């Protein structure tokens, strides 16, 4: 390894606890499990002979870690390896694992994929009902959890819903964060129009990806009170990175392949 740089100092940790307290989650007894899944498309370093190497990385950060990582700082951190030599890929992964584990104060997994290994991955879509094509009027783009409603019939159903219309904003740069949101639940029927209005109400809301998804989970859980609930977001790529957090109180396994906008 060459170019001795303290790459770790580029990383900016953001405490999960502050936001969780803000939305009145019990930090010692979270109502969900989950992970934040990062895909890195612009990852490069040098081998021991100085030949540039490239890979796509998939990183999974456990929901019980103390911190998330501010994405701009993460991009700067990743780019700091572009001119560094490593004897092999294992050495590179070990550096990433040690630095990121220290930053988040929690569990992390990192896998590198060659282009050949993923070239046959297909673009997929969420399964279930897309709620985007409703003939409804939208009048508010300010975060409004009270939009959420259940239907009048008192029948327990199991339903998978999704939207591609979600937008929130980065609290650091105020740039838009675009996402597709998947919601699977078992419980009293959630009114589709109310759910879409609620999700669109994030359009002027400033919050990190992970925080938005925990807020959505918490709002639906508290207002609609489903027996089971899973919320999964796949955000579009920015700076060569997409972030895909999920939260669930049941046995949920998210698919990890790209959506059309990723």
Curated annotation (Swiss-Prot):
The lineage of its organism: Bacteria, Pseudomonadati, Pseudomonadota, Gammaproteobacteria, Enterobacterales. Keywords: Cytoplasm, NADP, Oxidoreductase, Queuosine biosynthesis. Catalyzes the NADPH-dependent reduction of 7-cyano-7-deazaguanine (preQ0) to 7-aminomethyl-7-deazaguanine (preQ1). It is an enzyme of class 1 (oxidoreductase). It is found in: Cytoplasm. This is NADPH-dependent 7-cyano-7-deazaguanine reductase. Substrate binds at residues 69-71, 209-210. The active site is at residues 170, 177. Pathway: tRNA modification; tRNA-queuosine biosynthesis. It catalyses: 7-aminomethyl-7-carbaguanine + 2 NADP(+) = 7-cyano-7-deazaguanine + 2 NADPH + 3 H(+). The keyword Cytoplasm applies. Its main location: cytoplasm. Its EC number is 1.7.1.13. GO terms for cellular component: cytoplasm. Homodimer. It comes from the Bacteria. Belongs to the GTP cyclohydrolase I family. QueF type 2 subfamily. One of its GO terms (biological process) is tRNA modification. NADPH binds at residues 71-72, 238-239. GO terms for molecular function: preQ1 synthase activity.
